[in-house]
Amino acid sequence: MDRAVSQVALENDEREAKNTWRLVFRIAILLSTVVTLAISAAALAYSMEASTPSDLVGIPTAISRAEEKITSALGSNQDVVDRIYKQVALESPLALLNTESTIMNAITSLSYRINGAANSSGCGAPIHDPDYIGGIGKELIVDDASDVTSYYPSAFQEHLNFIPAPTTGSGCTRIPSFDMSATHYCYTHNVILSGCRDHSHSHQYLALGVLRTSATGRVFFSTLRSINLDDTQNRKSCSVSATPLGCDMLCSKVTETEEEDYNSAIPTSMVHGRLGFDGQYHEKDLDVTTLFEDWVANYPGVGGGSFIDNRVWFPVYGGLKPNSPSDTAQEGKYVIYKRYNDTCPDEQDYQIQMAKSSYKPGRFGGKRVQQAILSIKVSTSLGEDPVLTVPPNTVTLMGAEGRVLTVGTSHFLYQRGSSYFSPALLYPMIVSNKTATLHSPYTFNAFTRPGSVPCQASARCPNSCVTGVYTDPYPLVFYRNHTLRGVFGTMLDDKQARLNPVSAVFDSISRSRITRVSSSSTKAAYTTSTCFKVVKTNKTYCLSIAEISNTLFGEFRIVPLLVEILKDDGVREARSSRLSQLREGWKDDIVSPIFCDAKNQTEYRRELESYAASWP
C-alpha cells in the first residue's frame, strides 16, 4: 500500500512538473510575441517616419509650407483663368473682328479685281494697313459719362504731306474735298494758275491713297494714284467720295461768275467722273436739263460724298427757277434755329419775315437758294440712275455748300453757315429708296464761323445774307445708344474775318482746349476734318485739311493738319508742335508764324540756317 501511495505521489509530481514547464513555455511564447510586436512596431514606425513628440513642434511650419504650396497652385490657376478670360473676352473678339474685316476686304478686293479684269485694267484694289481695320468710319469714342470737352486735340503732328502746293507766287490751290472708306481715301482740289478768283480756267487735282503705319508707328497718308485734269474743261466746286470702284467725283463746269450763273435761265453743266484703281480717269456729263430742270444754278457741295446702299450721295445746292414746281413747293416754308442761351430779341412776326427772306438773298437776284442731295448708282457705267432729293425748308436753312458723312450706321449732312445761323449744323439723314430724308440738326454753339454783319459769328436773329466759310465738323463722341454727343473740327475763331484757325472738340454748348495753327492773325479759309483710329494702339487721330494763307507761294496753301485726340482735365489751350517745347538743341521758335512774310531777309536767313543746323 505504501508502494501504491508512493506511485501516486510520483505521478502527481510528474504531472505538476509538466504543468510548470507548460506555464514557462507559454510565458516565454507571450514574451517573445510581445517583443516581436514591439520590434515590428518600432520597425514600422521607423519605416513610415512616424512623428515623435519632438516632431510635433514642426507641424505649424509644415502646415504653413503646405498653405504656401496650395496658394501658389491657386495663383497659377488664377493666372490660367485670367489668360482664358483675356483670350475669350478680349483677344478672341478682336481676332474675330480682324478676321471679319480681312475676309470682307479680301472679298471686296476680289470683286475689284474681277471688275478690273472685266475692264481690262488688270489693277487690284488698295487697302489700308491692317492697323486701321475697324477704325475707319466707326463710332470712335463711345462714352456716356465723361464731359465731351475733356477730350481735346494734341499739338499738330509731323507726317507726310500728301497734298501738292502751289509752285509760283500767282498759283492758287483751293477748295479741298476728302472722303475715306474702309479700304482707301480720295482727295481733290482746284488748281488756278493766276490768282484765286479766276473762273475761266483751272485744273482739278484728284488722288487716291491708303493709310500706312511707318516702322516707328507713325501715321501717314500714302498716295497711290493721282491725276491732274488739265484740259479745256473748267471743273469747279468738286465733291469727291471713296467708292468700291475708286474715287467718284461730282463737279460743275462753269465759264461765268456765280452771280452770272444765277441770272441765267438754264441749269449748270455737271459731270460725274471716276479715278479707277488702275489710275485711269473717266467722266460723263449728267443730263442736267432733266435732272435740274427747275434750277438755274447747281453746284456740288464741295465737301465729301458718301457711299451708301450701292449709291454715292453728294451734297448739292443752287438757285431754283422762279415759279417752277420745285420753287413753288418751297414757297412760304422756313425754319428758325436759335442760339444756346442767347434768344433773338426781335418780334416773332419780324423774325418769320426775315427767316423767309433769308432763302432769297439779293446777291443772286432774289432766286431761292436751295439745299439738295444727289445720289448716283455706283457701277461701271458713270452717271447711272441719278436721283435728286430736295428737302423741305422747314428743316434746312438757305442752300449752301455741304458734306455727306457716314459714321457707324448713322448718316449726316453738314450745311455751311452761309445764312444767318453761325453754329455748325449736322442734319441726321435717313436713306431709303434712292432718296434722303433730313431731320432737325445737331447744333454746336461754340463751333462758329466768321461772317459779315448782320450775320457775324455772334449773330442770333434771322437775316438775309450770303457769308460764312466752309468748316465741317466730324462726329467723334457718341452715347452707347448711338446718339451723337460731340464733334471734332477746325474753326476760324473770329467774329467777322477769316482769321485764327483753331482745332478743338465740341459739344452742343462749348468746346475743349484748343490747338492753334499759328497766331490769331493767321489768315485761313475752308477746313474739312476726318477722324480715324489705329486699332493696334487704340489711338484716335483727326485730320483737318485746311486752307492756310501762304504769301510766298500763292494766296493759299492746303495743309493736312494731324492731331491725336487726348483726354484729361487740363488747361484750355494748346499750341501747335511749332511752339511746343522740344528736346534741348532744337530751336523751333524762330519760325513764326508757319507761313510768314519775312521782313528782314538777311536776319531771317541767318536764323533759318541756325535752325536747320540745330536739328540732330
Swiss-Prot record:
Q: To which species is this protein native?
A: Newcastle disease virus (strain Queensland/66)
Swiss-Prot/TrEMBL GO biological process terms: symbiont entry into host cell; virion attachment to host cell
Q: Return the domain comment text from this UniProt entry.
A: The C-terminus (head domain) is involved in binding the cellular receptor.
Q: What class of enzyme is it?
A: hydrolase
Which residue spans belong to the Virion surface compartment?
48-616
Region annotation Important for interaction with fusion/F protein: residue ranges? 124-152
| Described purpose of this protein according to its UniProt entry | Mediates the viral entry into the host cell together with fusion/F protein. Attaches the virus to sialic acid-containing cell receptors and thereby initiates infection. Binding of HN protein to the receptor induces a conformational change that allows the F protein to trigger virion/cell membranes fusion.
* Name of this protein: Hemagglutinin-neuraminidase
Q: Where is this region: Involved in neuraminidase activity?
A: 234-239
